[in-house]
């Protein structure tokens, strides 16, 4: 429910999370892009997690076509943006050029910073090209999504090449990584080690380890925080995170 999401977000915020990546669901638990539900979620997070960066998902799980961007007029700080298609375990994750450009345009209109979700090398190249043409609002922020079957593998050599590609084609760009399932912890470590940022949480991984289910999003945030401390990279406060991303 929305109230459960707000409570979970507050726990994660207290644990050190600075960005909330959010989806919403119907009462029957099916995914939706209903702007009214996103509005309630945004209101609750803004009230209980003041100044936390709110990021809405425009992914294909909760709708099709322009329905996926129906919540953008609510003006979250950020929104996810997929800039290419790829295979998932049982389906094609389709993002047509027309839809990509429309979503990017809506984000520019409403001054929303995209988090580009890259499931493939071509997505990284496309994101850099879109940024160079002024099609993306704000600085480029790319997330490498690794470990989904039939898509980008969680392989360090691949990861390192993607980091070098971003640094070569658009120096000083911001990037982060998301590891799916058992790959979450190792992606956290790779990102922190190489100077990037991390995503964690129950959407991508439901376990602390092979035998233990994660009790909450906050428990996974705490693991990421511990890795940061191991590499002497203290987690950013919400204020510092907004400075890094140049969000007001």
Describe each region flagged by the PLM.
Residues 17-27, 54-58, 117, 241:
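Short beta-strand segments at enzyme active-site cores
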């Amino acid at each position: 429910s929305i109230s459960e999401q707000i409570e979970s977000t507050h726990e994660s915020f207290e644990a050190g999370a600075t960005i909330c990546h959010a989806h919403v669901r119907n009462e029957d638990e099916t995914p939706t892009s209903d702007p009214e539900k996103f509005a309630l979620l945004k209101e609750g997070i803004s009230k209980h997690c003041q100044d936390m960066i709110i990021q809405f998902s425009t992914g294909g799980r909760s709708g099709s076509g322009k329905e996926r961007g129906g919540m953008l007029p609510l003006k979250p700080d950020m929104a996810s943006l997929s800039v290419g298609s790829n295979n998932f375990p049982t389906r094609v994750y389709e993002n047509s050029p027309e839809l990509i450009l429309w979503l990017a345009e809506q984000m520019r209109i409403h001054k929303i910073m995209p988090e580009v979700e890259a499931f493939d090398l071509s997505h990284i190249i496309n994101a850099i090209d879109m940024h160079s043409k002024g099609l993306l609002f704000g600085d480029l922020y790319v997330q490498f999504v690794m470990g989904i079957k039939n898509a980008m593998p969680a392989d360090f050599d691949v990861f390192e090449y993607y980091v070098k590609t971003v640094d070569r084609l658009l120096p000083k760009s911001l990037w982060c990584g998301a590891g799916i399932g058992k790959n979450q912890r190792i992606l956290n470590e790779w990102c922190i080690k190489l100077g990037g940022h991390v995503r964690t949480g129950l959407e991508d991984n439901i376990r602390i380890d092979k035998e233990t289910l994660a009790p909450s999003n906050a428990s996974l945030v705490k693991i990421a925080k511990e890795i940061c401390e191991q590499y002497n990279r203290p987690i950013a406060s919400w204020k510092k995170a907004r400075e890094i991303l140049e969000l007001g």
